[in-house]
């Protein structure tokens, strides 16, 4: 880049982003002509319209207001024709009769040249509902999965867009099916719409490749610092007529995706002078650049310190905020520092000034987690019920044919699987068979994908379980906790280990946590209505302990060949330890019928939580 384009890091030893191995895609290289395969849909190219005149302020057409009215979430707007009829206690789902029919929609063109119909969804009084709750409730009642585009609040309403007539028609079917906590019915108004603004302005794959190249020129590998100051006016972008405005959601998303894929170890980022007036679209940087220590947001349009709440998950040590309107909100320096440190307690420098050391109550000495206390059942009746259920369940689960589990699940049961997600430590190869079905909500942000990976009805649940690797569980080492119980419902979790017995990962040991919600069954047993399974690689300690304590062969009485003295010792040991006769005999035999040694071994193993619950079932 020309000398006049340099800023923030003035040196001549600029390097490209380090080569990184993508997931299954070989090493990363900077290739301008190669399309970005993860870029998603594209939109129009450079905008030579009024959006350039306002230097990147986001505008969006509202189909209710006509094509000339700009979307501005901060202005009060009068009610328009048709809005006044709503009764707050009776809300309906309606398609406006003075607009285009829902089946026709507003036309838009995708990158591949196909035409798409767009619809704007409006929820009157939607502002009083949490976004996650509102979308999940609509999705639960909608007959097809949908992807809400550009969800936002405007005055008292909530809005989002969908991109096809089938989805719009399905949303019409949600009429009178959702009620809030005050038993008010929630309506959905559907209008044909032009494509949402951010979709129109998505960068094309070739533009993303150019942006990637320019970001590589602005990256200092020695300092792990990326300088995106005044990115829109970058000479190379201007020369190629590419308009990258970081206060547009599509541009910020493309930029953060490039960072995530190529330099997630980034330590310093300069976003000064980019006309940023909100940080909603930047919130994912917490996951995409978790090591970030220095952030420069100076010379932007941030009006309130509350915008920083969107990124307060960053462990920042240095932050620049000068020349933002928010700086004028504070009467003195101490209140300014206090407000910022409330969001970033480890901050050492603000606007270039050293801060006094943060007050910390962190315990420097290493602390040990308390030892596991073993299972908790509440009552002996519940203990007997749950242990009997688990023994029957895992006999079938480990048999190789899990079809028999159909009788363990309710007709409307649901089930999900998840595996660990850590951006700094990607899933290792030996968990590959679980990746495609993992519903880890820390990784999956799209409601559509979350919905798809939730298995509904007992037929689908058991079909899904049949596809998982064949297993052998260490039932004797299960730790069971009952967390909730009513007369009609029981919630309990199971922790343990299992071994895969076939396939590429044969003999691999896994640890798992499984949470069951069950209701009473007609046979005095349990019927599962909800099943959540979490699988991870077993730790070295878990591998060492696994299958170490095999269950003795059950019998109703002591072995007949025992001497009278041994039988008397066995009865006494069973009474004092609380274990049944089979496990008491095993303990005595393992210690050569030395009563004192047996008692000491029992006390030690019980303190470590290594005696299974079945040992106490009589």
Swiss-Prot record:
The minimal CTE binding domain consists of an RNP-type RNA binding domain (RBD) and leucine-rich repeats. The nucleoporin binding domain consists of a NTF2 domain (also called NTF2-like domain) and a TAP-C domain (also called UBA-like domain). It has 2 nucleoporin-FG-repeats binding sites (one in the NTF2 and the other in the TAP-C domain) which contribute to nucleoporin association and act synergistically to export cellular mRNAs. Residues 564-618 form the TAP-C domain. A motif (Nuclear localization signal) lies at residues 66-99. SMART domains: TAP_C. The gene is Nxf1. The keyword Cell membrane does not apply. This is Nuclear RNA export factor 1. The modification N-acetylalanine is found at residue 2. InterPro entries: Leu-rich_rpt, LRR_dom_sf, NTF2-like_dom_sf, NTF2_dom, Nuclear_transport_factor_2_euk, Nucleotide-bd_a/b_plait_sf, NXF_fam, RBD_domain_sf. It is found in: Nucleus, Nucleoplasm; Nucleus speckle; Cytoplasm; Nucleus, Nuclear pore complex. A motif (Nuclear export signal) lies at residues 82-109. The keyword Acetylation applies. Coiled coil: none annotated. Residues 2-59 are annotated as: Minor non-specific RNA-binding. The modification Omega-N-methylarginine is found at residue 41.
